[in-house]
């Protein structure tokens, strides 16, 4: 597979995750992460538990339909590091009644059995200064 085709496949994974989140499908969202060995880095903490992360999303963002908000990944930049590894950097915005979140994701993508997954996910949240959100 060419670098362009791999980058397109990675974008498709991210697009499917975004769509799953926006319909409240947390299992579908988590399908983009390597299970069980994904590593999450956020708020100064490292977490290595796929199931605990799914449980966190359901507890914190689930509940009433639509409470998960609307998630968008933008400005997606992909650099192929090897035939089975890529770096992805993107901006994200989560708009929800409980408060908006914006920031940057840095992800290590790995290819296993022909499919791309997020092996390492780093989130850097920034203050949302957009008065329209």
Residue ranges and their predicted role:
Residues 89-93, 108:
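Residue-level recognition of well-ordered beta-strand positions that form the cores
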